[in-house]
Amino acid sequence: MKNKWLSFFSGKVQLELTGRGIERLLNECTRQGIPVFHVKKKKEAVSLYIQLQDVHAFRRVRSKFKCKARFINRKGFPFLLLKSKLNIGFTIGFAIFFILLFLLSNMVWKIDVTGAKPETEHQMRQHLNEIGVKKGRLQFLMMSPEKIQKSLTNGIDNITWVGVDLKGTTIHMKVVEKNEPEKEKYVSPRNIVAKKKATITRMFVQKGQPMAAIHDHVEKGQLLVSGLIGSEDHQQEVASKAEIYGETWYRSEVTVPLETLFNVYTGKVRTKHKLSFGSLAIPIWGMTFKKEELKHPKTEQEKHSLHFLGFKLPVSYVKEQTRESEEALRKYTKEEAVQEGIKLGKQDVEDKIGENGEVKSEKVLHQTVENGKVKLIILYQVIEDIVQTTPIVRETEE
C-alpha cells in the first residue's frame, strides 16, 4: 500500500517495447537500477511501467539497443497537476465547490430541544445564542457537547439535567426539568412539634390550634400546633399547617492554614489548531518558530469530528490551548485567618439551614494556633424553620 501511494505521488509512465533485444534491455535496466514493473508480453510487443523520474535514464539505456519504445499512458499526481493547470478555471471552481460543500456539511442547521416547557426552551435558546451555539455556526468553532451541557446546567436554574448530542448538522437536546412538588390533595390529621430546642421568633398558624407563642422557649418534640380543634365535645381533627421560625444555635469547628500554596494562571496562552488523522496530528495554524517557554504548562484539547455529506470523515479538528501557571503562596495573619474561618463556618451553617434560614450573629468560643493552622470553635446564632409534623395519636379507653 505504501509503495502504491509513493508511485502515485511520484508519477509513472507506461511504455510499449517492440523489436529485437527487449530482454537484454530489461536486464540492463536492472543493472542500472531502473525499476521496471507490471511487465506484460503482448504478441511481439512488451508493455511495462517505469517511474517518471527514471524516464531520462531509460532513454539513455534504450539508445544502446535496436528495440523501439513508445509512451502509451501516464499516471500519477504530477500528470493530474499538469491537467489541472491546463484547466485552471475548472480546477478552481471544483475546489471552491468542494470547500463550500465541506463547510456546509460541518455547520449547525437545526437545534432540536425535547422535554422542556416553552418558557424553558426559550431560555435555553437565548443562553445558547449567548455562548455562540446557533444555526449557521461551524461545529468545530463551537463548544464541545460536554461544555454546552455544563453551561446549560449551570446557567439555567430550572434544569436538572440536559443531554447534548451532535448528529450530522443537528444538535439534539433532551431536557429534564426540576419538578415542583405537587400539591397534596389530602393530608392526614397531624400536629406540629418543634424539631429542635429553640426560642420562637416568628409564628403564623394557618390551620390548627396554637399551643405556643412568640418568645416561648420550646424543647425538641414539644407540641406547637395541635391538629385537634373545637370544644372537647365536638373536637375535629385537621392537618395542622403553620410557619414557625425559632432562634437556635450551631457549634462549628473550623481549621484555616496560615499559608497555602496553590496554582494560578498567569494569562499567557498558546493556541494551536491541528488536523488529526488517528494518532497523527498535523499543525495547520498557531505554530511559532520563536517558542517562548511556558512555566508549569497545562494543556487542554477540544476535538471536533469533521463530516462530509453526512458521513464522518477519518479526520478531526483539534484546538489545543496551553496555559502558563505558577505557584502562588497565600498568607494569612492570625486575625485574617480567624475572619476566614468565621466565613467558612457561616457558609457551612447556611447550607444546613437552607435558603429560608438566617445567620444572625457568631461568637468565637475558642481559638488556637498549632502547626501553622488556626483552629476555631464558633457558635452561630441562627433563625430557622423549626416545624416538624407528627400524626395525631389518641389514647384509647380500656
Curated annotation (Swiss-Prot):
**Topology with respect to the bilayer:** Single-pass membrane protein
Keyword Transmembrane tagged: yes
Transmembrane spans: 88-108
Superkingdom of origin: Bacteria
A Pfam family per the record:
YqfD
InterPro entries in the record: YqfD
Q: What is this protein called?
A: Uncharacterized protein YqfD
Q: Say which species the protein is native to.
A: Bacillus subtilis (strain 168)
